[in-house]
């Protein structure tokens, strides 16, 4: 075949691919335009009767924008708007002041210190702030004709849609529970992502959260110059997040984690249903250990040897899985039935949230990377109610690592640094604590390839996993707390001028008779009125007579509460005032 013929054939195929992509993009844009075309006639969402365009414009022009928010500060605020608008030309939201406008909280200039709210769940990040420009409603006469979006909108930012850990932790989980925070929102809302990213590698996962196609900021320009939302919710609940990435202080678990494994597992169940993944029985017909395999970086250099050793030690099949080569639904199917998940530290480990109860997570750390400094997956695995076992293994042998100093800086290369800094990094035995996100020593070490020392890994795993690893049925493990003790009362008796007795009694919390509890104890605090200190007692019975240091003709304050299984502390009953 002549070279010219080959080139012509190649050119035709490339041109056909380009034209096909162009046609698909045009079809997608046309579909979006058709969806909002009705917005020029009928802005009201949901089952309510649809007002005509003139009525919608009148409501906006006369009444203006309406805003009511929950949360006290910009880091925990979610706001509900009526008639919030967005200018595609200015790329800003607009609050129109009319005769029915409400703005709660009405912060004045404090709205800019630093913002009304965070659009993403990464707290107080200066690229994630939301605010709006204020205009009188009369200014609508001089602006482009508004297009009314017919959907209830949930407006937010994705933080890093190309990283699976960020996708789940920062976006999907918070979106899932924010949609359920307000009645009907999960079934009505369309997601509007305003951060400016393209769809990214995991956009199909976002589509699972709502029956309506999510829209990106770039797509809004095809819909009109001025968009107005009859109903919009702005911001995300952060209550499901468990980790901070080190923008202000070195990364680590959040100081006040408010989510448990119960909420994580309910979200995982929803995602599995949407992905059409069944957890009924192992897909391979038997129990197995699953090892994440990577092909570009952070390689396990002796992967085959590792698979064989794990199979021999635990007497079960070992299987590899790869996000690079397999569909995400297939990955979830394998993870959700695995007895053990083994992986080098990386975003793929967030899939541990799909593991069955009783499974084990084994996280491998390259040379010079301290497992105690990087714990997003340990924190996830050890949340109350996740019921997972967690093992961290660290390569302590420099001869078992392969580094890549020649790579680009964002893949761990250090050739761009001066020679002294390169030498320091090469000689370092541990990456010091650091802030996010471009620390060259951290990147150099985390992108190493590792030959796993099999005996030390097996020994490390066996410290945690004593028997055969594997899923197991477990009873409800998230603790149920006692209520208040009931009918607390006290009775005193005086014996002479210097001795007295104080008897305190109470009834069990009313919810105790409906619960199976291994151990019930009671905590009593005894304080002489006017003193700053109290004496605590742990008691097994529902009454007790106190004699030590009880004075006659003295007032005592007494608090009583119930404790289940040593750790589940109930509320104190109302204070008893006891006179001897």
From Swiss-Prot:
Cite the GO molecular-function annotations of the record.
acetylglucosaminyltransferase activity
Named in its record, the pathway it takes part in is: Protein modification; protein glycosylation
Question: What main location does UniProt list?
Answer: endoplasmic reticulum
Sites where a glycan is attached: 99, 276
Q: Which InterPro entries match?
A: FN3_dom, FN3_sf, Glyco_transf_61_cat, Glycosyltransferase_61, Ig-like_fold
Membrane spanning residue stretches: 5-25
Q: Which residues lie on this side of the membrane: Lumenal?
A: 26-580
The topology of this chain with respect to the membrane is: Single-pass type II membrane protein
Q: What is this protein called?
A: Protein O-linked-mannose beta-1,4-N-acetylglucosaminyltransferase 2
Q: Which species is listed as the source?
A: Canis lupus familiaris
């Amino acid at each position: 075949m002549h070279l010219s013929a080959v080139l012509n054939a190649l050119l035709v195929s490339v041109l056909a691919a380009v034209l096909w992509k162009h046609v698909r993009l045009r079809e997608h844009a046309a579909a979006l335009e058709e969806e909002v075309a009705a917005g020029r006639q009928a802005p009201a969402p949901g089952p309510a009767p649809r007002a005509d365009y003139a009525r919608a414009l009148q409501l906006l022009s006369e009444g203006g924008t309406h805003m009511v928010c929950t949360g006290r500060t910009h880091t925990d605020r979610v706001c509900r708007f009526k008639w919030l608008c967005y200018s595609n030309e200015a790329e800003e939201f607009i609050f129109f002041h009319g005769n029915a406008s409400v703005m709660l909280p009405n912060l004045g200039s404090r709205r800019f210190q630093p913002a009304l709210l965070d659009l993403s769940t990464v707290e107080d990040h200066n690229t994630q702030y939301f605010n709006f420009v204020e205009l009188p409603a009369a200014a609508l006469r001089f602006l482009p004709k508004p297009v009314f979006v017919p959907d209830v909108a949930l407006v937010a930012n994705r933080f890093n849609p190309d990283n699976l850990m960020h996708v789940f932790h920062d976006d999907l989980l918070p979106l899932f529970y924010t949609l359920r925070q307000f009645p009907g929102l999960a079934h009505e809302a369309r997601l509007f992502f305003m951060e400016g990213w393209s769809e990214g590698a995991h956009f199909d996962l976002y589509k699972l959260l709502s029956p309506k196609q999510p829209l990106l900021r770039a797509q809004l320009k095809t819909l009109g110059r001025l968009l107005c939302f009859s109903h919009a919710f702005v911001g995300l609940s952060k209550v499901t997040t468990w980790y901070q990435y080190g923008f202000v202080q070195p990364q680590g678990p959040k100081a006040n984690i408010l989510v448990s494994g119960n909420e994580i597992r309910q979200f995982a169940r929803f995602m599995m249903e949407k992905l059409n993944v069944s957890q009924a029985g192992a897909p391979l017909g038997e129990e197995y250990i699953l090892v994440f395999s990577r092909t570009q970086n952070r390689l396990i250099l002796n992967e085959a040897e590792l698979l064989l050793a794990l199979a021999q030690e635990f007497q079960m099949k070992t299987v590899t899985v790869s996000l690079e080569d397999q569909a995400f639904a297939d990955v979830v199917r394998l993870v959700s039935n695995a007895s053990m998940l083994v992986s080098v530290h990386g975003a793929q480990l967030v899939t541990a949230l799909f593991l069955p109860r009783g499974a084990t997570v084994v996280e491998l750390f390259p040379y010079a990377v301290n497992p105690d400094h990087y714990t997003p997956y340990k924190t996830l695995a050890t949340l109350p109610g996740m019921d997972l076992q967690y093992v961290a293994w660290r390569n302590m042998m420099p001869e078992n690592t392969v580094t890549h100093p020649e790579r680009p800086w964002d893949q761990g290369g250090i050739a761009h640094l001066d020679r002294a800094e390169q030498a320091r990094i090469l000689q370092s035995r541990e990456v010091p604590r650091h802030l996010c996100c471009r620390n060259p020593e951290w990147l150099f070490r985390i992108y190493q390839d590792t030959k796993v020392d099999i005996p030390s890994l097996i020994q490390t795993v066996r410290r945690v996993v004593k028997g055969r690893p594997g899923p197991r049925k477990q009873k409800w493990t998230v603790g149920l707390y006692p209520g208040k003790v009931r009918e607390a009362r006290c009775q005193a008796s005086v014996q002479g001028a210097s001795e007295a007795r104080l008897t305190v009694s109470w009834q069990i919390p009313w919810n105790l008779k409906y619960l199976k509890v291994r151990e019930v104890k009671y905590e009593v605090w005894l304080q002489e009125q006017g003193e700053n200190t109290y004496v605590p007692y742990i008691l097994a019975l529902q009454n007790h007579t106190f004699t030590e240091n009880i004075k006659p003709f003295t007032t005592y304050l007494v608090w009583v509460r119930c404790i289940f299984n040593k750790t589940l502390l109930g509320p104190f009953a109302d204070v008893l005032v006891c006179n001897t």
